[in-house]
């Protein structure tokens, strides 16, 4: 078995059998690569590739004025350095962005009035600032106004052409009406559809339908062109007395029953008898013999056919029959011929008649009938018709109609199929246009209609719109590109108007451009688009999943009300591309999906998944990425197919997928095989061990609930994992990886300094400083805290984990805790999924988490004067001010509770007119307190915690208070420390290199005391200060130059370091950009410690969730034979009906892992007593198995082995990958090696009585998570508070400090009990009887206990509503009084 070695700190025993040939790609690559493509550097002009910001500029520029006397061209663009880095933007509530500078060229022409010839008069070039462009952080997010946001990728229908039918729903007969739709990337939609009478219609932008021939006329075709495009011509030759002779096509009669005998024209022989079915064999025989070329058709066989072209009298030009006219033969009731077009032709002596090849079996007369029904006969009237539909109410002219029609589909500014659309159209219609042809062509429209008619005739298949070849992904870059294009087009209109209105010779490009529309479009997209979402930052997994999300909602997508079942369902093409498990449970089910683990998005926006190539039944290591359309052509085997040593299939028949169907196929026909069993599922689902044993519904809940797990105080990686925990921790950015190899120079809680020894470039000081995030608040108020894992002097390699983040443990994702559980009922406390916990869990902070709340207060400049942040608050006692410093701001470390003042603030009050007495008192005592009111920020009810950080922001030019200056000093000191450390390492490196250069060389001259020509030795250098070493001039010219170069490099790096430091200090000291009217802002961060308590929600990884019902003293919990009390008691009835048996296997495996860990712990104890390593090595061999032990552990030296063994004493971690994990035999083997019974059950004793329970109980170790549904956040109480304005009833919800709704059903309950007075009280004085409420308050104050109920306000609202309807309604008492 392969062995995964994660971070070299802890080994996982790996149970996977299938060899992995492909590394899992970076999990946030989707976001990063897309935005990188959008912002790719624009220094050098690039060809018009239509990609990224370059493509946007090239599609909008050049801009000409209305007279075409000037043109504004785009030259290049450049992104400057961002003003603030990511951390500064988060602290200051700024957007992390870089200024975009665009170089534009304005060319002014001289126009010769006589000839109209243009000559260049003037060319001006200038750099123009075009607003700020948000940048992506290294973790694939954006900082917008100080908060981290994610742009979710959108799934939408790919541009191209689609064929479909209405499934028989439109017409009562259930007839299938076929339709075709051309969807461009941007521009008007074009639909073609059949109606119930089999006529073909076109619609533009879903407006009123027109006959499709109107559209074809508009394209410049005439009646004859349309006939030729859609029908073949067959000539019928008249044979007197016998009928008509025509060409014979044997294929046409296959499977039909001819109504008349089919007769060979040459021999008169009957080929097929009337009424008999023609078999395929008979047809094949006719084709093979090939001696029947023409057949004889009875005279009336031509009646009802349609003429293929105009038949004209040669002499006088009179038209007998027009193309498309029906050939008729009119007979009266006596049988005498009275007329008809056929008679006219025969009378005129026309013996050969070309007719349209329509047999109404394989070819229908749809297009001919549509032509006949169309009132238009030429291009002009057809264009006018289209104009009337598109612009109803406007008087049409031919020029306007023609211009409108051209801009609809043939103007690249208005219509864009995109490369994807063109490729899809070429594939569907077998065309070969270049993918740079982005508008429609006449051939495209004609081919679409042809394919639609073929469908109606029974040839071809409709498209499946849910196939992933017909749905594509728009990632960040593309969404941003579209948005920016909208902004630039708005700007273009303004530029054109300005070019016409100003004196063009004197202006510069800067004067023509107002970049606001473009900047506003960007701001609007990041701030308010449906796809720009507040990042889910509960834990590292939720971050990664959010970035990999695919949404079908959003602008240009579906709406959840209109999305049907098919769109939401799992499709065969989702395999390896989109996860069939992870999706929300509510109304968005199936509309929001997750990218599968190995999937990636190709340049056309289609999702691809990797496969290994199979050649002649042998699996190779060559990996190919396939989109859904490409995969349809292949036969794909599953990753778990049995292979022999050489990689060939063992079985003759292999389980495969062919064009969406699961079949058994011979091994020779297989040409691809999955790269890994987990390529089917998403990241969250692949973190569930034994996923294959869980029901899909529960697996869905498990995937979703892992994202809600709160990071705990002490992270603990799962004993039973799947092997990808390390990948998630790495790619999420939670754990810190070394950028390059080197030695640890310094470590403390806030930073790690590495002296790099690898990947050094000339001029690089080789110092990497990693700043750790300490107790920062995430978007979800969880705590982001990083802890170093390394010691000074440690050697680290590139990408080694050097620090753990939230929910990571030694570089592995750790969302919950390994705890000992027992499946048994316990006095009804685990009824309905309740969970019973031991007091030990609460006492030892096993599931304690830290949450950080942010409170913000701003002092504004009001009309009555500025607000002030101060400690001097009117009518507040010293006790309430105990936590405030002299500036009125709470100090760090203060423990605060509900109602405590965090920041003291006073606001000027409106002056009320003073009485003379007040004026006198004011004059004598200078009483000032009356004109300000206390608006201090207090802690809301229900919150307790410790102040961990305070930030003070001052406006430019506002004097800083003592607290602000203190914070500033601390920040500057921290920056200075960083600078000094970097300088020290730089000096150490440079002087070490200098020493190597000059040691043993001859000095020509040097500082005082060094004789010319003396050799440079250690002793000599020891007598000089380091600064004097540079003064030693070497004899060798080349070496002297190298020393000089080193000196210059050293000085340059010192200057750069100082400049960087000064820039940062200047930013700290500079005032802050605050919103208008705000003079000063204070943010207070409070850390809240949340222990596990009844009402908190917990869950496992298998969708098994529950709420804690009771905390039981440790001594009362059931305990094992060795006296160990269990931590959790779960209900066994929660397993069978839910069918998530994976949790039981996990429990057994975890029990075995714990048993192994205890054995290793015993062996370490033995080693400490005797100093003998043998027991430790044996215990490790037993735990990991011989093969893995030999491969990874046997070669370790004693210290390394002891460290590894010490890390697994609580339990030996194992990895059981999804669909390729431990089987039942492996579980039994693990239990046996750990010394347990293979049933996984143990004897348990009742903690209260000490008696053994009657039967054995399943006990094991399970990984449980604490979810972000904490009872502290939900519990809430109110006495008096805010009321709704209209109804005067208390508001609802904790956020509004609302009350508990006493609803309709609750009223029924009280009525049923006959509790009349209680009911009256509930509906009046405790709710919306305003006068009654006041009276109750008064009687409470007076100490009385009587009150009177009045009329509820909601009744008054009802009366007013009824009066609003014009009905007078009054409330009268028994005496008839109002």
Curated annotation (Swiss-Prot):
Keywords of the record:
DNA-directed RNA polymerase, Nucleotidyltransferase, Transcription, Transferase
Q: Which PROSITE patterns match?
A: RNA_POL_BETA
Q: Which InterPro entries match?
A: DNA-dir_RNA_pol_bsu_ext_1_sf, DNA-dir_RNA_pol_bsu_external_1, DNA-dir_RNA_pol_su2, DNA-dir_RNAP_su2_dom, DNA-dir_RNAP_su2_hyb_sf, RNA_pol_bsu_bac, RNA_pol_bsu_CS, RNA_pol_bsu_protrusion
Instruction: Give the catalysed reaction(s), semicolon-separated.
Output: RNA(n) + a ribonucleoside 5'-triphosphate = RNA(n+1) + diphosphate
Question: Gene3D superfamilies of this UniProt entry?
Answer: 2.40.50.100, 2.40.50.150, 3.90.1100.10, DNA-directed RNA polymerase, beta subunit, external 1 domain, DNA-directed RNA polymerase, subunit 2, domain 6, RNA polymerase alpha subunit dimerisation domain, RNA polymerase Rpb2, domain 2
* GO BP, sorted A to Z: DNA-templated transcription
- One GO cellular component term, please give it: DNA-directed RNA polymerase complex
Which NCBIfam families does its entry note?
PRK00405.1, rpoB
Which HAMAP family does this entry report, sorted A to Z? RNApol_bact_RpoB
Function field: DNA-dependent RNA polymerase catalyzes the transcription of DNA into RNA using the four ribonucleoside triphosphates as substrates.
Q: Hey, which family's this protein in? A: Belongs to the RNA polymerase beta chain family.
Can you state the subunit structure given in the record? The RNAP catalytic core consists of 2 alpha, 1 beta, 1 beta' and 1 omega subunit. When a sigma factor is associated with the core the holoenzyme is formed, which can initiate transcription.
Can you name this protein?
DNA-directed RNA polymerase subunit beta
